[in-house]
Each structure stands twice: as structure tokens, then as C-alpha cells.
């Protein structure tokens, strides 16, 4: 086998292998040549070459999102490293393990005017779980730092940074390894669940308990929890589309429920106890409601973090939901309440009004989502881009067999396509990305990728700009708005599809969308379905929807 001659590179490769870090996303460069040589010449590693570092990082994020294990990113020195930052921040807030391994020049070459050189040490400090700044020579201290970084990425679920100085020559190889790495076995800390008696008493006394579930991996909220929560009349469960949690008694279309509320409705719906699980919340309306009508108690259940999103957090249970509810459920009493029946009656009325309204609207983004979502393949994976796409998806129910993901850690539009491609590769599932035109164009280099599988398909809603700005309070139809907010355009994905060997279909109305969607779903290759919707109709259709709910 071929190894890099530089001992420090050998140590990194040996430790990655021993610790099970086997998926390596490499961006071409010279300074990282020792790592590239070592990883690509060892068959235990699955290596990917992605030239654009920003795309590479989101691609790795998608793989790690699905594998639930760290993925390594390897880049050269200089600004290449900075291009990882958007995905690095997303990994931090979405709790996805990434290990960035950046090649650097030796410390003596920093800030002396050498080319392709920046201050790389601690460059991700604000969003990194650990920063391992290595020195040139092999040492136990270096080995310990590398292993600590991988351990924390794995157990604390987030990104870490290993900065590695290499001096030239960089391309020399040897046939045998020269390092003897000391492997560290880390203790895994599991926090015990505290005595719940006080919380059980509070629960038993409360007639209005609201459960709000944000983004979760599939099966994190187990069926026994779902059954318990769904059948207590004092409990209302609201789930976001990314929660991957389903029950007929749960409320999925949160905004449709609460947008028409009067002050009296808000007061009646105000919970005494709020329990939150999962990641970031998409709905602005539920956040505004809970910040104004605060619960007496807010408990968050998560092994690692708890954000005080509503300014009312009183308790963080640092365990998995399954651990908490397994202990909690046997201790509580059922309580008759009108909270759930009241909410389900509202849900029934809102659903009827929604169906009536959808039957009357013209072709638009809203109508397109109504047509697309029920036709998605069962047991597939749905990746959704940010901005208006995820908000439209929130207005519909999605079949329980479909797994839903969205980069809601930082809610950026910048890497949705790259993430979805990585996720499609790692999951092996039929993967559909629903994206808006600005998000798609922003990340079009994602298609510059030799690993795109046939199970990956894109449904692109092209409304000629950033349509979400038309439904925000600052919308005014003028040149400033069109240019600097909406970023109006007349671009199409047709020739990008041709350049990157994607299939391409086009829809412009309900009839062609139904026809082309069927073709897209049944096609056995990667394909883009571009759906053109009217720029100046979409916002009115959506705004009138909420007016019609009253």
C-alpha cells in the first residue's frame, strides 16, 4: 500500500481508520496532498472529490446527516478553508458531526507574505466543538488532539476543526508506515435522569399541555411516545414537517391553526406546560404566539442542547425523549380536559376551509405544492430548500413513510442542493429535492459532482425571483424591491441540466405539472423538473389563503 512520507499525515490517516471515520470528502489542492495520497490509496476509505469547497462541505453534511456518523472534509491552505464555514455553522446548529481537516503551512510561514496563506488556527472558533491546532512533528499530544476532536464530533454531534501544518516536499510516498499511534479509549458519559416527582405533579395539575416538535431524525420520537401523547385530552401536539412524527390527532399545519386566532383564542390556547423536542422551529407564528402568551413551564428534552426560544425555558432534560418518557409515562395520571377536543375541532374547520380554497386558486406555488406532495414516492426521502419552499411544505401533510429533511440550523439557502445529493448517496433512497429558483441557482455548483446517483431528482419551483419577499411586510412593487430583494430574473435550469447530464422536464400549469411529475417520478435517472409559476400571483394566493381561514 502507498502511504504519504510525512509522518503526521500517516498518524491522521491511521487514527481516522481506527476511529471509524471512513467517509472522506476531498477538495483538490497541493498543501493537502499528503492526506489525499493517504486516504485515496487505502481501500477502507470511501473518498469523494468535490472541487468547490462550499459545495463539498454541504455534500459532506448530507452524508453525515444520513449516516449519523462523522464525515471528514479535507482541503488545502488559504481561503479554501473559509468556504467550509456555511456548512460548518449549519452542522453546529443542526447537531451534525463533521471533521474538518485543513492543511496549512508551518507556523513560521504565517504572516510573512507567503502565498495562499491565512491565519487558519481557530478560524471556526465561534461554532466549533473543538479546535485541534497540530504541530509539524509526530507527537502523542498531536495524536490525542486528533482523537479528542473525532470523539467530540461523534458524541456531541457537531463540527470540529483539525489544522495540520505540512512543509514541502508534499508528494513523496513510502511503502510502509513509520508511526506507532497511541489509541485512546474514551469513556462515554450518559447523564442519568433525575427524580421526576416534581414534574409529574406539575403535569398532573395542568389541563393544557402543548408539545411542539421541531426537526427530528426519523424514529427519534418512538411510537409509544406518540401513542401516549395522542390520547391525552389535556395534550395538544404540534409537529413541523421536518419532525418526521405523524398521528391523526396531531396538528401539522401550525400556521393555518393559529394565524386566524383572536386575542381570546390565543388566551384559550395558551398552555400551562410547554414541552419541546427536536431542532429549530420553522413557524414564525408559533414563536410569536409562545413569546407573547408564555407557558408557566417550558421543558426541553434533548441530550445536548436547549435553546430558550420563547423566553420561558424552566427545565432542560438532558436525555433522549425515549429515556424521559419511559420513566415519565407510568407516573402520570390521565386528566379530562377540553384542550385537545377544542384544538381538533379547529383543525377540522381549518382543513375544510383549506380544501375549499385550494379548489378555487389559480396555478401558483401553493397549487404546485398541493399537486406535488401527494405524488411523492412512498418510503422516499424529501429534502426541502429554505425560504418559501419549506414554508409551503409546512402547510400540507406528508405521508408518514416519507422522511423529510431541511437545513434549518442556520436556515440558509446556500447549500440545499449539495446537502440533498450527499443525503441521496448515503441513504440509497429515492431522494427528491424541492427547491426554489434562487436557492437552486445559488448552489448550482452542486451539480458539478461525479457522484450524483440515479435516485436523485430535483423539483425546481421557478417564480422568477425570491418570492418570499413578496409576502413580507416590506414588499413594494418598485425597482429597488425587484433588484435588491426579490432579485428578479429570467433564468432557467434547462441548460444546466444539459451540461451536467440531468434529464429535464418543464411544467407551466396544472395539466403539464401532473404529466411531467409522473414522468419525473418514474424516470430511472437524475432529472430536473422545472415548474414555472407566476411571480405576481403567488403572494396574493398565499396571503388570501390565510384571510380565508377566518
UniProtKB/Swiss-Prot annotation:
InterPro entries, A to Z:
MenaQ_synth_MenD, THDP-binding, Thiamin_PyroP_enz_TPP-bd_dom, TPP_enzyme_TPP-bd
Q: Does the keyword Manganese apply?
A: yes
**What pathway is this protein said to act in by its record?**
Quinol/quinone metabolism; 1,4-dihydroxy-2-naphthoate biosynthesis; 1,4-dihydroxy-2-naphthoate from chorismate: step 2/7; Quinol/quinone metabolism; menaquinone biosynthesis
Q: How does it assemble?
A: Homodimer.
Which cofactors are required for activity? Mg(2+); Mn(2+); thiamine diphosphate
Question: What's this protein's name?
Answer: 2-succinyl-5-enolpyruvyl-6-hydroxy-3-cyclohexene-1-carboxylate synthase
Explain the purpose of this protein.
Answer: Catalyzes the thiamine diphosphate-dependent decarboxylation of 2-oxoglutarate and the subsequent addition of the resulting succinic semialdehyde-thiamine pyrophosphate anion to isochorismate to yield 2-succinyl-5-enolpyruvyl-6-hydroxy-3-cyclohexene-1-carboxylate (SEPHCHC).
* Key word Manganese present: yes
Q: One GO biological process from the UniProt record?
A: menaquinone biosynthetic process
What note does UniProt attach to the cofactor annotation? Binds 1 thiamine pyrophosphate per subunit.
Enzyme Commission code(s) on record = 2.2.1.9
- Gene3D superfamilies associated with the record: 3.40.50.970, TPP-binding domain
Amino acid at each position: 500500500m502507498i502511504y504519504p512520507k510525512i509522518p503526521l499525515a500517516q498518524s491522521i490517516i491511521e487514527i481516522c481508520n481506527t476511529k471509524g471515520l471512513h467517509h472522506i470528502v476531498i477538495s483538490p489542492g497541493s498543501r493537502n496532498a499528503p492526506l489525499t495520497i493517504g486516504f485515496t490509496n487505502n481501500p477502507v476509505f470511501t473518498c469523494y472529490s468535490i472541487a468547490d469547497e462550499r459545495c463539498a462541505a454541504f455534500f459532506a453534511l448530507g452524508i453525515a446527516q444520513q449516516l449519523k456518523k462523522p464525515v471528514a472534509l479535507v482541503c488545502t491552505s488559504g481561503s479554501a478553508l473559509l468556504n467550509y464555514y456555511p456548512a460548518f455553522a449549519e452542522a453546529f446548529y443542526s447537531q451534525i458531526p463533521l471533521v474538518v481537516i485543513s492543511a496549512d503551512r508551518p507556523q513560521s510561514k504565517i504572516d510573512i507574505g507567503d502565498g495562499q496563506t491565512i491565519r487558519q488556527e481557530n478560524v471556526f472558533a465561534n461554532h466549533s466543538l473543538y479546535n485541534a491546532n497540530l504541530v509539524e512533528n509526530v507527537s502523542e499530544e498531536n495524536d490525542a488532539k486528533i482523537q479528542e476532536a473525532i470523539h467530540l464530533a461523534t458524541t456531541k454531534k457537531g463540527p470540529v476543526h483539525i489544522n495540520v501544518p505540512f512543509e514541502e516536499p508534499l508528494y513523496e510516498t513510502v511503502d510502509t508506515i513509520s508511526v506507532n499511534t497511541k489509541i485512546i479509549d474514551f469513556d462515554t458519559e450518559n447523564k442519568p435522569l433525575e427524580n421526576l416527582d416534581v414534574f409529574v405533579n406539575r403535569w398532573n395539575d395542568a389541563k393544557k399541555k402543548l408539545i411542539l416538535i421541531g426537526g427530528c431524525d426519523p424514529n427519534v420520537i418512538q411510537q409509544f411516545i406518540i401513542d401516549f401523547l395522542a390520547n391525552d385530552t389535556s395534550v395538544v401536539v404540534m409537529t413541523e414537517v421536518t419532525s418526521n412524527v405523524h398521528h391523526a390527532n396531531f396538528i401539522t399545519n401550525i400556521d393555518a391553526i393559529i394565524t386566524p386566532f383572536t386575542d381570546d383564542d390565543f388566551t384559550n390556547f395558551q398552555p400551562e406546560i410547554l414541552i419541546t423536542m427536536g431542532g429549530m422551529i420553522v413557524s414564525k407564528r408559533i414563536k410569536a404566539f409562545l413569546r407573547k402568551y408564555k407557558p408557566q413551564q417550558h421543558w426541553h428534552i434533548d441530550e445536548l442542547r436547549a435553546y430558550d426560544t420563547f423566553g420561558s425555558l424552566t427545565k432542560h432534560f438532558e436525555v433522549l425523549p425515549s429515556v424521559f418518557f419511559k420513566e415519565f409515562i407510568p407516573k402520570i395520571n390521565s386528566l379530562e380536559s377540553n384542550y385537545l377536543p377544542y384544538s381538533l375541532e379547529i383543525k377540522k374547520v381549518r382543513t375544510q376551509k383549506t380544501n375549499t380554497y385550494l379548489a378555487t386558486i389559480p396555478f401558483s406555488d401553493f397549487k404546485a405544492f398541493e399537486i406535488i406532495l401527494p405524488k411523492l414516492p412512498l418510503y422516499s426521502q424529501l429534502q426541502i430548500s429554505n425560504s418559501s419552499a419549506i414554508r409551503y411544505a409546512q402547510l400540507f401533510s406528508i405521508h408518514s413513510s416519507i422522511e423529510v429533511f431541511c437545513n434549518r440550523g442556520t436556515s440558509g439557502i446556500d447549500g440545499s442542493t449539495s446537502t440533498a445529493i450527499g443525503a441521496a448517496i448515503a441513504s440509497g433512497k429515492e431522494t427528491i429535492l424541492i427547491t426554489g429558483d434562487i436557492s437552486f441557482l445559488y448552489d448550482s455548483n452542486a451539480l458539478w459532482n461525479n457522484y450524483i446517483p440515479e435516485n436523485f431528482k430535483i423539483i425546481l419551483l421557478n417564480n422568477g425571483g425570491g418570492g418570499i419577499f413578496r409576502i413580507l411586510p416590506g414588499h413594494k412593487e418598485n425597482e429597488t424591491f425587484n433588484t435588491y430583494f426579490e432579485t428578479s430574473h429570467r433564468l432557467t435550469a434547462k441548460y444546466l441540466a444539459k451540461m451536467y447530464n440531468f434529464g429535464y422536464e418543464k411544467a407551466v400549469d396544472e395539466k403539464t405539472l401532473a404529466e411531467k411529475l409522473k414522468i419525473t417520478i418514474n424516470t430511472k435517472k437524475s432529472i430536473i423538473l422545472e415548474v414555472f409559476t407566476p411571480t405576481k400571483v403567488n403572494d396574493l394566493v398565499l396571503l388570501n389563503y390565510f384571510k380565508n381561514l377566518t
